[in-house]
Design a protein with these regions (language model features):
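An N-terminal hydrophobic leader/cap segment in hydrolases
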Residues: 11-63
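Membrane-embedded segments
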Residues: 65, 70-140
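Alpha/beta-hydrolase fold nucleophile elbow
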Residues: 145-156
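Hydrolase active-site cap/lid region
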Residues: 164-214, 220-223, 261
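Conserved alpha/beta-hydrolase "acid-adjacent" motif
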Residues: 239-245
Length: 304
């Protein structure tokens, strides 16, 4: 009997040790993964595309209300309208968008998000504190001469951030967003579909940032943008964000709203798949809503 009890106790002790070891491993693994997410790779922008097309731009510094210096480029407008450009997670200033807008007379302001590129900042909050980055850019643009209207383009994380920002700041008059996510909670559920690791990752992220995951929810804020227009671009072969994100955001938004979704297009690849159509729709959208020039580049709502 004693041997049986001793054996049972040994088995129980071993099981507890194994469980403790697994828990510690998951905890350490989770901390490492969360730390990697909060510290994205830095890609320093070079401006090669802008120089190739002889686009005038100035290096400027923006300062957020929480004291973060952001490195940016600014091109003054020839038509009275400036477009803010917010890039995605781990990405850089989108020179391809900058070029197509600047060559059509738009002013452009593009910056490295906090903890990205040449900007200061220790961690990325994937949309939460990045709203302060947008506010710093918006304030800078509105303070420049010959600026009468401000619109915004965003990709991926930048798209989601701009939805949150535009819901707060009515000075953003028109919003074009490419591959946004509906909420950070949905995004993490999509990228980490594992019963134990998923809640652990969310818990650790909240500890590291002091931010509630559920507070980063563009789908709950997008309706506040109306009556200003929002244009949503969604590739239905997205593997970075849920491919139904665009439809959910469109359904949550109010008029005026537009959804452009295409089969077999990955995350933020619509331009590569349809470059002429993308450019035409982007310019037509801002021409109509910021300049009042309907049909200059065709109807942004139509195929073709």
């Amino acid at each position: 009997m004693k041997n049986k009890k001793s054996r049972a106790r040994s088995i129980l002790t071993f099981a507890v040790k194994v469980m403790a070891t697994v828990f510690i491993f998951l905890l350490l693994f989770g901390f490492a993964e969360v730390n990697n997410v909060l510290h994205p790779p830095r890609i320093i922008p070079e401006g090669k595309t802008l120089r190739k097309f002889d686009i005038e731009y100035h290096d400027v510094d923006l300062l957020t209300t929480d004291g973060i210096r952001l490195s940016a480029w600014y091109t003054p407008p020839h038509n009275g309208a400036v477009i803010l450009l917010a890039h995605g997670y781990g990405d850089k200033r989108p020179e391809w968008v900058y070029e197509m807008l600047a060559r059509k007379g738009y002013g452009v302001l593009a910056w490295d998000a906090r903890a990205h590129g040449a900007s200061d900042g220790e961690i990325s909050t994937i949309g939460y504190l990045e709203v302060l980055d947008v506010k710093a850019a918006l304030d800078y643009a509105l303070a420049q001469p010959n600026v009468e209207h401000v619109g915004a383009w965003g990709g991926s994380m930048g798209a989601s951030t701009l939805i949150l920002a535009a819901a707060q700041f009515p000075q953003i008059e028109a919003l074009f967003v490419d591959s946004p996510f509906t909420s950070l909670n949905d995004e993490l559920d999509f990228l980490i579909p594992y019963p134990v690791i998923n809640p652990l990752a969310k818990f650790l992220a909240e500890i590291e940032t002091g931010i509630r995951i559920h507070e980063i929810s563009p789908v709950d804020e997008i309706a506040r943008i109306s009556p200003r227009p929002v244009y949503i671009v969604q590739g239905l072969a997205d593997t970075v964000a849920p491919p139904d994100s665009g439809e959910k955001l469109f359904n949550a938004a109010r008029e005026p709203r537009t959804l452009w979704a295409e089969e077999n297009v990955p995350h933020q690849q619509m331009y590569l798949d349809n470059p002429r159509r993308y450019k035409r729709r982007l310019l037509a959208f801002f021409d109509e809503w910021l300049l009042g020039n309907y049909g200059t580049h065709g109807d942004f709502r139509q195929n073709g």
